[in-house]
Design a protein with these regions (language model features):
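Glycine-biased, small-residue-rich flexible motifs in mid-sequence functional cores and linkers
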Residues: 1-185
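Single conserved hydrophobic/aromatic residue that forms the stacking wall/gate
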Residues: 183-194
Length: 194
């Protein structure tokens, strides 16, 4: 049941722990973004996840506050499959307020981690988690991220892994949109040959 696309990456995990049914029989798309998201960003993530789920995609995210939570909720609202990739052991729910969300995800999809039981969430775990989020997906959609946000790390991994990378442009006066705006600006430069 190991995610086949993840095996194609340059640094796949040696193993995965999971809760629920990890039997994803459909293409996966990651929806990631800022923990300090705006209401607009949460609504966009929820809507994208709902619509993509209805089209048959499995939604993958990191179950963090903000955009990740909204993406999982959108998939669940549509009756779709969703996978949460944790930056801690399966026995630890992080953030704690997502306990019910974690249970719901495990009942219809899966909660997975490469970290052993007892491993707490810390800053160095999240970039490791992000390579799994992008690695098991065909595409990554970033909805709100500052320039140095973890979602931009996921975007970088997506590029290195040959995955399609998309960003939702946001308001130019929002710090939470700066990373997406930078990405869309760079992509536009590439299209213009700049």
């Amino acid at each position: 049941n190991f995610p086949s696309m993840l095996l194609e990456t340059f640094d796949p995990p040696t193993g995965l722990y999971w809760e629920g049914e990890y039997n994803v029989d459909r293409p996966c798309i990651a929806i990631v973004g800022s923990r300090r998201s705006t209401l607009y960003g949460q609504n966009v993530a929820r809507k994208f996840a709902t619509e993509l789920s209805r089209l048959g995609f499995c939604i993958v995210s990191g179950m963090a506050r903000g955009i990740d939570t909204a993406a999982h909720q959108g998939a669940l609202t549509a009756g779709g499959k969703t996978v949460a990739v944790l930056g801690c052991g399966l026995d630890i729910v992080y953030p704690p307020e997502n306990l019910e969300l974690s249970k719901h995800i495990a009942s219809v999809g899966a909660v997975i981690s490469e970290f052993p039981f007892g491993r707490r969430a810390d800053r160095q775990n999240f970039p490791m988690r992000n390579r799994i989020v992008s690695g098991m997906c065909e595409a990554v959609v970033v909805v709100e991220s500052n320039v140095a946000g973890g979602s931009m790390i996921t975007a970088r991994f997506a590029g290195e892994q040959g995955r399609l990378m998309m960003a939702v442009p946001g308001r130019i006066d929002q710090v939470s949109s700066a990373g997406c705006l930078l990405y869309t600006s760079d992509a536009a430069d590439d299209l213009r040959g700049g």
